Amino acid sequence: MTLRDVRYRVEYVLFRLAACLIEALSVRQTVSLARFGAWVMTHVAPRRVSRYHVASENIRAAFGADLSDAQVEQHIFRMWVHLIRLVVETIQLPRKLNLRNCRESIVFRDRAEVVQVLCSGRPVFFLGGHFGSWELSVATFGMFGFPMGVVARQLDNPYLNEWFRKSREQTGHRLYSKNGGFEGMDELVRAGGHLALLVDQDAGRRGVFVDFFGKPASTFKSIALMALEYKAILVVGYGVRLPDNPLEARWAQFEIGCEEIIDTTQIVARDEVKEITQRFSAALERSIRRAPEQYFWVHRRWKTDPATRQKLKDYEAKAA
């Protein structure tokens, strides 16, 4: 047994011990824990650790540079409250939510339109972002009898990765790694299956730049390219936590909804890939604007500058 394996095992044991405590938390206790944790991350933790400056830059990029420091700090505090609650709810999800009690916790907006698309016989790509409760959104469709392939990054710790894999697959889904899972996804979609993907990660210099909160954001082309190849229907959705009323409720309450349905066979544009990418990015932005505190502002969404992409093009042109 290597030192690394020992570390992974210790991490897993500590996680399972913490999970046992977390699973027993009530809504009121979760809110108190989240607010305390958010205060620590905002006011005590080193800003390099809390990625405070990244979140601050992103929030100002999205909502205007004229926001005061106090307003930005309030946004960041509320974001951390959400993220800590998200971690707790993700761990509690397998025990707290099932088909018998889901009506108590979930409101499904535009359900009829989504079910109609799912029954169309065509592949459906469910697109979302690091927003709201993305784990719950996907799990709900599995409970309703619509399993899909879920694309996610594999965790470094194999024991933790296996725990999360089982948690995600217990409602009938199939987990595919972002690296090396294409063959499985291809087989699933060609058989008429559905995929769930997060679409708000920076794609580097080779991505397609589209407007996201009024600023160019590098976005992966592969989503639009796959959708065009398979003639897939895109459903841009979300799952947001609703206000706690009352705090004594059995569990938190959520709204799952469809922001936009995009039929890729109906796209008429000079650059179909960019048009599709812009449309689903704009739809995601609209949903985030309604609950900005539930977005993951600490990730580098605008990491790649469009000027970097142009430099790459110039270099490739000279090399040719």
Residue ranges and their predicted role:
Residues 1-128, 162, 166, 172, ...:
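Membrane-anchoring hydrophobic helices of lipid-metabolizing enzymes
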Residues 2-7, 65, 69-77, 116-120, ...:
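Non-catalytic C-terminal accessory region of glycerolipid acyltransferases
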Residues 13, 51, 106, 177, ...:
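Soluble or luminal CAZymes and related metallo-dependent hydrolases
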Residues 17, 54, 112, 136, ...:
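Short Gly/charged-rich anion-binding patches and loops
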Residues 52-54, 153-158, 217-220:
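Active-site metal-coordination segments of metallo-dependent hydrolases
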Residues 58, 135, 168, 200, ...:
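Acidic active-site catalytic centers that drive phospho-/nucleotidyl reactions
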Residues 100-106, 153, 170-176, 213-214, ...:
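Short, flexible loop segments at the rims of nucleotide/cofactor-binding pockets, characterized by
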Residues 118-179, 205-208, 212:
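Catalytic core of membrane glycerolipid acyltransferases/transacylases, capturing the structured
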